[in-house]
Regions:
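Conserved small/polar residues in nucleotide/adenosyl-binding loops
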Residues: 104-110
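Conserved acidic/glycine
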Residues: 1-39
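Thiamine diphosphate
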Residues: 35-99
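Anionic group-transfer/hydrolysis microenvironments
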Residues: 30-32, 52, 109
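Short, ordered loop/turn segments at secondary-structure junctions
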Residues: 31, 77-79, 106
């Protein structure tokens, strides 16, 4: 069985779906490398938004795009998205029942024994 990291699988699916769906927009918080989103950013620069180190804005902008009919996917390292943007997740996404997807990625060191 071949195992691939979840973040690569997510990027592969987004790449495939973006071929036919121009409403897909991927946003990230200065983490295109660690989120494995560089292939998507290269293939679809008009559907990729680099938000910089601004997790609150990442969530708010993705919620706004979703309200306008876009399919927004916001990616950020787990430690930042879960803490820095809690209020935006609660108010901009949850309270308004917004169809925006936020996902995190976590990179763990591997050790050999």
């Amino acid at each position: 069985m071949n195992k691939i990291p979840n973040r690569k699988a997510i990027c592969d699916v987004l790449l495939k779906e973006a071929e036919t769906d121009k409403d897909i927009v991927v946003l990230c918080s200065d983490s295109r490398g660690s989120a494995s989103l560089a292939p998507f950013a290269d293939a679809y620069p008009e559907q990729f938004v680099e938000m910089g180190i601004a997790e609150q804005d990442l969530v708010s902008v993705s919620a706004g795009l979703a309200h306008c009919g876009k399919k927004a996917f916001a990616a950020s390292p787990a430690c930042f998205l879960s803490t820095r943007s809690y209020e935006q997740c609660k108010i901009d996404v949850a309270y308004s029942n917004t169809n925006a997807v936020s996902y995190t990625h976590l990179t763990l060191p591997t050790t050999s024994r």
